[in-house]
């Protein structure tokens, strides 16, 4: 047994050593150039703040349409995770990424259904290329958003599991309006 264990350890070390031998080192100059390009020179704090202590904001996603920026974000309507109903998805707009104006809801609570209390949406098909367009592309003539949905109340899956749904719209993505949501989850536990 001792010999087999020693062989296994030696083999593991040889494999690990072989893998790391081919790893490329990145110079300090290259790392500094990357840092200089992506650093945030100023800290501005929250650009969208909740209206009171009984609402929490989370999960911002930014995209561009025309010459304006848009941000979706989720709002939890509770204070401690157990007292609220759940998440809704909202939309805001900005010219400079610092001053934001809230436009309204995209995924609202529903009266019934698998996703009636949790609707945390995340826009899909955004061009994230560095210095790219940051626009949200269409698929089959619609804009899409994946979302966490659930019927349990509270923060996320505190009472019941969350599932994944898809929402879409043919409407104007620069305006707040209800998106069409899945009648059933596309991914569930």
For every predicted segment, state its role:
Residues 24-121, 126-189:
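Beta-rich carbohydrate-recognition and catalytic domains
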Residues 1-2, 20:
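Coiled-coil-like amphipathic alpha-helices with heptad-repeat character
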Residues 13-22:
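Hydrophobic h-region of N-terminal signal peptides that target proteins for export
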Residues 9-10, 96:
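A residue-level detector for conformationally permissive "hinge/kink" positions
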Residues 2-9:
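Bacterial N-terminal signal peptides that target proteins for export
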């Amino acid at each position: 047994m001792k010999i087999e264990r020693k062989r296994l350890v030696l083999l593991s070390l040889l494999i690990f050593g072989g893998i790391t031998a081919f790893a490329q080192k990145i110079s300090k100059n290259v790392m500094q150039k990357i840092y200089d390009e992506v650093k945030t020179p100023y800290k501005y704090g929250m650009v969208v703040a909740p209206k009171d202590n009984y609402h929490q904001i989370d999960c911002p996603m930014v995209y561009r349409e025309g010459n304006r920026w848009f941000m979706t974000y989720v709002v939890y309507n509770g204070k401690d995770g157990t007292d609220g109903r759940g998440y809704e998805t909202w939309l805001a707009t900005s010219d400079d990424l610092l001053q934001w104006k809230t436009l309204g809801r995209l995924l609202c609570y529903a009266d019934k259904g698998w996703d009636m209390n949790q609707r945390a949406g995340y826009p899909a098909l955004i061009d994230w290329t560095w210095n790219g367009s940051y626009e949200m592309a269409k698929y089959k003539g619609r804009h899409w958003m994946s979302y966490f949905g659930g019927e349990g109340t509270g923060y996320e899956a505190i009472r019941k599991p969350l599932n994944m749904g898809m929402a879409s719209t043919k409407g104007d993505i620069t305006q707040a309006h209800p998106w069409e949501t899945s009648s059933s989850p596309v991914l569930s536990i």
